[in-house]
């Protein structure tokens, strides 16, 4: 599928986070399998090294990196994702998650680079297992969700050639303990856990999202806001049970309910990918 790949220079920002790690690994693999590996040039930037050092709180750093590379596509995976940290540090959260992406969109517009912004699914009222569409009403219960909504607004105002992807990811990395790590750890040690059957999601694996991001990067006709998610909406409790079943383990759990207001986070995070499916070959 990639033998007819048009030349592309891709910059991944936030390349040492969970999604960034998967994306860089995937793009490196694709590049090695191309007839002409020079057709896909990959650059990565993060606060932890990689090709370039990038501190998102210093906007001039972004500008100098884009000037050095002149990328065709910039994928922004940078975000402070800890809800607790965002609540304790709202100004830093707004700067990194909210306003920096808007500035990045402006630089991309100047450089004629395509921006792919990774957003979130934390935007909805408690409406059960609903598969939310892009035009459904949004709201926020915490600083993290507020900052990601601001990013969407800033990019839309200041950018030109961009894609905003609302999504929720699952995966494993060596660098940080993920939700999937927590599930596997508890299953392997037969620990009793509290499972929430009123918290809904449409999680997509980082591997699959990485593949989709590359396909979107090549599709120059798409722009705007899209949900990129699992086709199904399921509770986090059901996800836990499904993974346990796959490993042939009988899980020990007690059923619990989440109160979104008390917790200060949305629990109805289902997404519908019908818009992107109608406009592309993605599945």
PLM segments and residue spans:
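Catalytic helix-loop patch of NAD(P)-dependent Rossmann-fold dehydrogenases
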Residues: 95, 99-103, 123-165, 169-172
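NAD(P)-cofactor binding segment of oxidoreductase domains
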Residues: 74, 88-116
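NAD(P)H-binding glycine-rich loop region in Rossmannoid oxidoreductase-like domains
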Residues: 56-96
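NAD(P)-dependent short-chain dehydrogenase/reductase
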Residues: 153-201, 206-208
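N-terminal Rossmann NAD(P)H-binding glycine-rich loop of SDR-like oxidoreductase domains
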Residues: 10-30
């Amino acid at each position: 599928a990639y033998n007819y790949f048009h030349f592309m220079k891709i910059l991944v920002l936030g390349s040492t986070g969970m999604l960034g790690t998967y994306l860089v690994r995937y793009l490196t693999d694709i590049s090695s399998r191309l007839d002409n590996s020079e057709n896909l040039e990959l650059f990565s930037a993060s606060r932890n090294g990689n090709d370039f050092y990038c501190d998102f709180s210093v906007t001039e750093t972004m500008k100098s990196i884009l000037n050095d590379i002149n990328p065709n596509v910039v994928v922004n995976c940078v975000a402070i994702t800890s809800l607790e940290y965002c609540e304790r540090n709202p100004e830093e959260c707004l700067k990194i998650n909210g306003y920096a992406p808007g500035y990045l969109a402006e630089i991309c517009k100047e450089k004629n680079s395509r921006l792919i912004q990774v957003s979130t699914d934390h935007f909805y009222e408690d409406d059960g297992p609903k598969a939310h569409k892009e035009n459904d009403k949004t709201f926020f219960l915490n600083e993290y969700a507020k900052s990601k909504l601001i990013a969407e607004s800033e990019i839309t105002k200041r950018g030109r050639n961009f894609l905003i992807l609302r999504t929720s990811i699952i995966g494993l990395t060596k660098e940080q303990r993920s939700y999937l790590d927590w599930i596997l750890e508890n299953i392997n040690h037969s620990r009793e856990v509290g499972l929430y059957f009123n918290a809904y999601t449409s999680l997509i694996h980082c591997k699959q999202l990485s593949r989709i991001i590359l396909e979107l990067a090549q599709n120059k006709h798409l722009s705007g806001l899209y949900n990129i998610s699992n086709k199904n909406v399921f509770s986090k409790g059901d996800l836990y049970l499904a993974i346990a079943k796959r490993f042939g383990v009988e899980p020990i759990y007690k059923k619990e309910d989440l109160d979104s207001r008390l917790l200060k986070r949305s629990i109805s995070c289902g997404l519908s990918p019908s818009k992107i499916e109608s406009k592309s070959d993605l599945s």
